[in-house]
Amino acid sequence: MQQSKEERVHDVFEKISDKYDVMNSVISFQRHKAWRKETMRIMDVKPGSKALDVCCGTADWTIALAGAVGEQGKVVGLDFSENMLSVGKQKVEALQLKQVELLHGNAMELPFEDNTFDYVTIGFGLRNVPDYMHVLKEMTRVVKPGGKVICLETSQPTMIGFRQGYILYFKYIMPLFGKLFAKSYKEYSWLQESASTFPGMKELANMFEKAGLERVQVKPFTFGVAAMHLGMKPESK
């Protein structure tokens, strides 16, 4: 029987959890850290605020958010892979971040009341969910009026020549890196599949608006290899 997308993604991340952080650095040539840092600068996270990191994985962005909100704030990281969360919990405990809570859960059904968080993020996770729009609507639901929803994700480069090189890299070279460094050719083949079918920047910006967000900002990184999308939930009338 053919696996659903959700089942396949779950299996992938359960299997690669122990090598995920290393492979992120290898695959992006360490650029993912700079992309996240610039995204955080644009977000302008206020101390004492409350944030949710959806599809938090091994909790790197969760930890960055914890540093921004400070000890008086609160950050919740949510992921459906218990193995990925286990790696994240080790990091959080090592840093003694009491303002962080990591939860096992599904991005399609966020277990929170409406209007709970000041910031809701998803980093390199939206492409892996069964329904992009449904998850964006869930993120919009749980963010407070005036709060921000942010997605940092791979994208589709548009520059001629660079785009072709990007496609070749993701299709052939990245899975080989997976086999070499993580013994996971099959799992890293999935990552290129999910990236290649993910919406482009303009299409995702339109989805943000359809999800109920306004003042949508788009910031491409490294010639469009990745992009930040940020939208605000309208203030209550």
From Swiss-Prot:
Molecular function terms, GO-annotated: demethylmenaquinone methyltransferase activity
Keyword Transmembrane helix set for record: no
Enzyme Commission identifier(s): 2.1.1.163
Protein name: Demethylmenaquinone methyltransferase
CDD domains: AdoMet_MTases
Top class in the EC scheme: transferase
Protein family per UniProt: Belongs to the class I-like SAM-binding methyltransferase superfamily. MenG/UbiE family.
Pfam families, per database record: Ubie_methyltran
Biological process, per Gene Ontology: menaquinone biosynthetic process; methylation
Positions annotated to bind S-adenosyl-L-methionine: 58, 79, 106-107
Entries under Gene3D superfamilies matching the protein: Vaccinia Virus protein VP39
Keywords in alphabetical order: Menaquinone biosynthesis, Methyltransferase, S-adenosyl-L-methionine, Transferase
UniProt function note: Methyltransferase required for the conversion of demethylmenaquinol (DMKH2) to menaquinol (MKH2).
Organism encoding this protein: Bacillus anthracis
Pathway: Quinol/quinone metabolism; menaquinone biosynthesis; menaquinol from 1,4-dihydroxy-2-naphthoate: step 2/2
Gene: menG
Catalyzed reaction equations: a 2-demethylmenaquinol + S-adenosyl-L-methionine = a menaquinol + S-adenosyl-L-homocysteine + H(+)
InterPro entries (alphabetical): MenG_heptapren, SAM-dependent_MTases_sf, UbiE/COQ5_MeTrFase, UbiE/COQ5_MeTrFase_CS
NCBIfam families: MenG_heptapren, MenG_MenH_UbiE, PRK00216.1-4, PRK00216.1-5
